[in-house]
């Protein structure tokens, strides 16, 4: 443990900058009283995300020491009691008395006073990530227990707090002069965050990894004493020599790239007072595209001026390259076209950043956009000119997206029930007559046979039927080009008229319920899985809003004494057969439907389509990350993941069977 607190110049490649750092550098702006009363104003709420935000705040302070060149090692430890310890081997928080508060140490002022810290002045930190002095005092106010230890000039200074109040005076003991840094151990207050909330090891580990990616010169030592998921180590040294390029490589499938190169760079400009790092790649489909940005190691999920600069640079670069090779199709390119399938990670370090809101989710600093744009544009021009084959391939990729977008826009501009101009709907669609979407339903069926029965069984005013031609495409393992050119997907998107992905507009959705109606057998379940995958990856908002349903057509028809009964699956058939045999000794005849097309329209209406007699399964989307993993495992490109998923589910099913048999 003591090694962590040691400072060794040989371990540190970056130059250490020694400056005078004392109590006079700590500025005081305000008090701490409002924090416990209104925590949401400072950390965005009192839920699990807000609680984990406390870890980010303490870690940001440690990262600031590293970014400023004063620390090379950071440690994060999650203890058995669910408390967290974060340590950095930096200079240590000043412990001498503060000029404005002669009876208080600077350490106590920082921990008990809102808006106190050294980050308001450029003399100590040129770039800072914590909440400008708010961070550690807010963590203290919202912690049941907090203990801070400072190693400085051969002494260990320690002090304990609870709910923002001091429990002990500053205590000092003699230690080795080699030890330096700050250690903070804290436990969130259950009165604020609920007793059932505990830190999630996976979440904290990912926070630590993201910080290590952002500053390649820092090593973060991770240790967890509580039980962790199989994909999270108990102990690890987190260090990424290639920074954001390493991060992006770990998040994408390298065999699914439009061009086999990641466009990345790492630039520091003393003249412009900016440090900039980025990594961008383009994938063959947009199902896993993402954009993450940071300013001074703080996540900016709502983007801001740094993202605007990057986007403008890439747009300008591609248009300039297109003009150079004489391709006129780039004239209509937009930022949305270029970043439709792009995954991006961006990090900037600047002096005195300006953010929107207390929790810093959007960067609004003036001048940053142009700086970022100019730097990245120069490097992107060189990237494109260095390999014209790859550059042309990338250009053709984004132009195809642009043309598809413009075609979809033209289709969306056509009103669904406009009396003077009819929508160019798919030829196989049997639309309903009601002009508004309220109370209407679209049944998606496979093939003309099932479509014919469904069209005869429907309520023409409120129910539409769309038979899909050919094989339904698995969008999880298909390129964007295949998705765009697939006839079944084109028909479906045109019929719904709501657009997909970033172009989704719920007000344009033409039906209130979208009902997947497939055969009740294994083949039907496979088709339903493909369609659900399509909706999850292309129209997740539609699923979240509760528009997607699965029909439950019968697989079996049971007849006894001229009475007809229906069963959806084998288990229901067995139960129904047993029940009928108990009530009557009459013979039971069992028939199995080969598909929806074999059913008479009256039967289909009675069992599957009549709103008062049918059963529907509503498809919901709650744990998005888990669903995303399942879709990737089961429907993605890698067969080994699919095999493992099926194998694990088979084991679960076998256990259920064994339990039922009581073996």
Curated annotation (Swiss-Prot):
Residues binding ATP, per UniProt: 21, 61, 88, 130-136, 360
Which reaction is this enzyme known to catalyze? ATP-dependent breakage, passage and rejoining of double-stranded DNA
Q: Which residues form the Toprim domain?
A: 440-554
Q: How is the cofactor bound?
A: Binds two Mg(2+) per subunit. The magnesium ions form salt bridges with both the protein and the DNA. Can also accept other divalent metal cations, such as Mn(2+) or Ca(2+).
Names of the cofactor(s): Mg(2+); Mn(2+); Ca(2+)
Q: InterPro entries recorded for this chain?
A: DNA_gyrase_B_C (IPR002288), HATPase_C_sf (IPR036890), Ribosomal_Su5_D2-typ_SF (IPR020568), Ribsml_uS5_D2-typ_fold_subgr (IPR014721), Topo_IIA (IPR001241), Topo_IIA-like_dom_sf (IPR013760), Topo_IIA_B (IPR000565), Topo_IIA_B_C (IPR013759)
What does the record give as EC number? 5.6.2.2
Keyword terms: ATP-binding, DNA-binding, Isomerase, Magnesium, Metal-binding, Nucleotide-binding, Topoisomerase
Annotated positions binding Mg(2+) 2: 519, 521
User: Sorted alphabetically, which SUPFAM superfamilies does this protein's record hold?
Assistant: ATPase domain of HSP90 chaperone/DNA topoisomerase II/histidine kinase (SSF55874), Ribosomal protein S5 domain 2-like (SSF54211), Type II DNA topoisomerase (SSF56719)
Q: Give residue numbers for the site Interaction with DNA.
A: 471, 474, 526, 642
Biological process, per Gene Ontology: chromosome segregation; DNA topological change
Example GO CC term: the record gives: chromosome
General function of this protein: Topoisomerase IV is essential for chromosome segregation. It relaxes supercoiled DNA. Performs the decatenation events required during the replication of a circular DNA molecule.
Which PANTHER family does this chain map to?
DNA GYRASE SUBUNIT B, MITOCHONDRIAL, DNA GYRASE/TOPOISOMERASE SUBUNIT B
> What protein name does the entry list?
DNA topoisomerase 4 subunit B
Organism encoding this protein: Rickettsia typhi (strain ATCC VR-144 / Wilmington)
Lineage of source species? Bacteria, Pseudomonadati, Pseudomonadota, Alphaproteobacteria, Rickettsiales
